[in-house]
Amino acid sequence: MAKILVLYYSMYGHIETMAHAVADGANRVDGVEVVVKRVPETMQAEAFAKAGGKTQNAPVATPQELAEYDAIIFGTPTRFGNMSGQMRTFLDQTGGLWASGALYGKIASVFSSTGTGGGQEQTITSTWTTLAHHGMIIVPIGYGAQELFDISQVRGGTPYGATTIAGGDGSRQPSEEELAIARYQGEHVAKLAVKVHG
């Protein structure tokens, strides 16, 4: 049984929605156990609420537990072409895992969101840098999801990983096409996890 963690940070709920779609896709594959968790919030509660942050019910992960999984699919919003500070803070606490090689050979993949589309690919590839230092097997999605070929509407989605475009004010929710790409990413990673670790 391959254990898969979908680990995310989401302030306004877009990445949370994508995380559940990724998990749904992974659950399509036999021989996997899928867990969805989030990284801790680093903002003060009052500031988070004032900024319009959305309360989320997913349990909070600890850096140490990452070693328990065969594959980890990371979800983070874009902050100026980089992962969110909350995800960065979480990953910066994995030095002990790096020193022991605990994540070496585990599968990793990344999905993201942006306000207007700028930086979504950079966020994914810059996150890969941290994962590469851990020796993780980085899995992009290529053009395996047919939705990536549809140019009839504004949407996220890249060969690097699933993305969504939230709009400058955050009012746009993930589209069905974006969620389909996220489900594809989860299924793709799960199939590989079963082959490698199952």
From Swiss-Prot:
Keywords: Flavoprotein, FMN, NAD, NADP, Nucleotide-binding, Oxidoreductase. GO terms for molecular function: flavin adenine dinucleotide binding; FMN binding; NAD binding; NADH:ubiquinone reductase (non-electrogenic) activity; NADP binding; NADPH dehydrogenase (quinone) activity. Residues 4-189 form the Flavodoxin-like domain. Binds 1 FMN per monomer. PROSITE patterns: FLAVODOXIN_LIKE (PS50902). Its cofactor is FMN. Substrate binds at W98. It catalyses: a quinone + NADH + H(+) = a quinol + NAD(+); a quinone + NADPH + H(+) = a quinol + NADP(+). Belongs to the WrbA family. This is NAD(P)H dehydrogenase (quinone). It comes from Klebsiella pneumoniae (strain 342). The lineage of its organism: Bacteria, Pseudomonadati, Pseudomonadota, Gammaproteobacteria, Enterobacterales.
